Regions:
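Structural and coupling elements of P-loop NTPases
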Residues: 1-293
Length: 293
């Protein structure tokens, strides 16, 4: 029944909390219960050590679980200043702990990209110092200087222009054409590269082609723009089968990409199975006489 299921998960939660300290572990084996404050303390410690990953349920459409999510973020997640779990690679190749600091040199991490026919937005979280429009920063991946465009804070689809983003802020920078998701923008006084975002290898492939002849370049351009937003899929032109092969996590991701090509880039495509380029191996040499006409 439901009660037994709840008790089972509650016991698993207590065991996870007990593993965060020797004191809690001893009390757990002695059969003692934890108070609410002690449970919260253990969860905070586990989250900070990346040994506990809370999962919450809710629905933004139905308005369910939003307050619970915010309360748990405030109570369980460490603040950026408490975390200090960012690994940074310096220009000389050595690594160090990156310290989040409002008074440090400006550093921002690009965690998302949105690109459409009207332009490109690079979403960043400022991890140190502050950034302003027209500031010149270094892209740690390329070593190039990047002049920042206009800065925005996003609320849904509404973009509000701001004059500054400070440490801890999440915002968007316009027209950063050479910047990709996972890049670190930093001050020239201290060039650091934070660990990028790992993406799973694509495991599902289909051939993609335009419904209207002559729109291959338009399809390729649209997929390249979408790949800036979602690097988890790949596009390869197979020279042997003469097919454009789209690879992703599954058919749902492919369907979303096809829909975006139609709505945002005004190009319709059709999908087909990937052709296999069969090969035969020469196993041995033989001598044969014959007449060639």
């Amino acid at each position: 029944d439901k009660v037994s299921v709840i008790e089972e998960f509650n016991d698993a939660l207590k065991e996870s909390v007990a593993e965060t300290s020797e004191e809690f572990m001893e009390r757990f084996f002695n059969g003692e219960d934890f108070t609410y404050a002690e449970m919260a303390q253990g969860l905070r410690q586990g989250v900070r050590e990346l040994s506990i990953f809370p999962v919450l349920c809710g629905s933004a459409v139905a308005g369910m679980g939003s307050l619970m999510l915010l309360d748990n973020i405030m109570e369980l997640l460490p603040s950026p200043e408490q975390g200090n779990y960012h690994k940074a690679t310096l220009a000389d190749g050595t690594t160090e702990e990156f310290v989040v600091s409002a008074g440090g040199v400006p550093t921002a991490f690009v965690f998302k990209t949105i690109s459409d026919q009207y332009g490109k937005y690079s979403f960043v979280k400022v991890l140190s110092g502050s950034i302003t429009p027209d500031m010149t920063m270094v892209n740690a991946r390329t070593g190039d200087n990047e002049k920042l465009g206009r800065l925005y804070t996003m609320r849904g689809k509404k973009a509000t222009e701001v004059k500054e983003l400070v440490c801890g802020d999440i915002g968007a920078i316009a027209k950063m054409d050479k910047v990709k998701t996972g890049d670190t923008l930093c001050d020239s006084r201290k060039v650091v590269a934070l660990k990028g975002i790992p993406f799973a290898e694509p495991c599902y492939s289909v051939a993609i082609a335009p419904k209207t002849r002559g729109q291959d370049d338009k399809v390729a351009q649209g997929l390249n723009r979408l790949n800036e937003e979602d690097p988890s899929f790949s596009v390869v032109n197979n020279a042997e089968t003469h097919q454009m092969v789209l690879s992703g996590a599954g058919d749902m991701q492919v369907d979303v990409l096809v829909s975006k090509l139609k709505t945002r880039f005004n190009v319709e495509v059709e999908l087909s199975p990937v052709r296999v380029a069969y090969r035969e191996k020469i196993r041995k040499t033989v001598q044969k006489q014959g007449r060639h006409k």
